[in-house]
Amino acid sequence: MDAQIKNEIVELTKAMLETFTKEYIKAYTIQITKKAIKDAKAIPSPYLLEPRPRDHDKSDVFSGYLVKLGAIRKNWLKRHFVVRYDYSIDYFVDDKHTNKKGTINLCGYSVNDDPNKSGLDRILKIAEKMGVDTSSIPKPAQLPPFTIELYHYSRRCYYIQCANEEEFKEWIEIFKTCCRRSHGFKNKDPCHIAAFGIAVRNTRWSLGRWGWFGYGGNENQILSDIILDEIEYDILGRALSKLPNAPWFIRNYLRNKMMTVIEGMVSSAVAPAWTGLSKTVEELRPTIEPRIKNQVDPIAQAQTNIINKMRESMMSQIKPAMEEHVNKHLKKIIGEIRTPIENGFDESLKIWNEKTNAYNGNGSTESFSSYRSYPNSYWTMYPAKDKISPLYSIVEEYRPIFRDYSSYFICYDIKESINNMAYDGAYTLEKTVTQDQVDVASAKNQTHSKYQHDVILGTNMQLKFVVREMVKPTLCKIINPLTKPLLNTLSSSIPSAIGDFIDINELYNQLVDDILNDSTQVVIDELN
């Protein structure tokens, strides 16, 4: 790696960490403010089902024998895998669990059901960046049928072999769920988690990277990932093109050595930066929380006033863009995406009915042990989730019009919402019986009515979610340059006493969401 490329990487890393630091401190302050306002206003949830506490059921989610490829000897070994309630995965020599061999945390990973293809695709992609003739590249060794790849580009990858197709399909979904639900953050404070995500988004936006970006892991890993992603986008191609002309295996070896150096440079900068930033916000919170609590009403009123001023001053820029690029497509989009979403939520209610009618316990907490975990089962929830599957191709058809969204993420998020509603439905019935002391028959009727209400609400919410995910990145590329001068003017008008607790960009983001939600609701009402 020459000195110029190395210096570019150092400067980019430094600039991104500086941007993230500023964005995170601001976002963390805003999240504490939001929490204080929410606590003071005691705004009720629109959903009627009780949200299931994360640790309500600590029983294992799933288990079974699989064959795992060893990291060092590269031999296939039979192991007993256990998915814990927090979606970490332990694996043992056998099902007696006396000899634990390791733990896998899949936060930030992806699941590939055809590792032979995905592995070759990655090699070809790298070869193209290095200017290598792809016809000269030897194909990698073929993995056995029913092999699953648990992939991360900068962490250890896992290769898991299943016994048959049915087992393969089941574990694919289990591993995908673990990727989505396992927690990588070391700091579990909700304000921190929300602020971190906003800071990641805003850091990427500051570089003009408007599209969807999936991430996961602990704080250091995520910060390293977003920097490495930008290095790959902006610098890596030029660095790889400067490698000496040589056979593929030599160039690939040099490329891997280069990536090891780059990853080391980034991680060595990220670790102390995050340690210092984390300490700063820990010291900040006890100082600002009392100030926020004393000014909840003025802050909330100022936020409302600013959003109203934004709407008044910016609609002349936003409305034409909505008419030209969004509104003319909404009726068709909603008409097409509505059926699979409705069907998915409706099917989840049918499953709840079946499982609830099958419950014949005595109403004790212990009698619900099997019932409360029914949403864990892939095959039990499959009929509801499968109803969402047609949505993927529908959403993909709009890529020529809207870009920078993930059809996979959209579909998977809705499937997760359906599954979470099933958890809440099971928990609500159990709580109504065991804590509220309502008889089982009456509790079933009460919970059924709540579930019906939430199915309608959940469908509506997910329609709006899909529209936002598809449309917003493209819309923001158009309207942000037009609205930026007005944002700057409004920002300068915020009273200094509460300026630290108001993020003009987040309020603008809320305004855009509100506009898209309102437009979507108009079409939903027309179609009803």
From Swiss-Prot:
Report the SMART domains cross-referenced here: PH (SM00233)
Q: Which Pfam families match?
A: PH
**Where in the chain are disulfide-linked cysteines found?**
none
Q: Which InterPro entries match?
A: Niban-like (IPR026088), PH-like_dom_sf (IPR011993), PH_domain (IPR001849)
The residue ranges of the PH domain are 59-180
Question: Per its UniProt record, what SUPFAM superfamilies does this chain match?
Answer: PH domain-like
Instruction: Supply the name of the protein.
Output: PH domain-containing protein DDB_G0267786
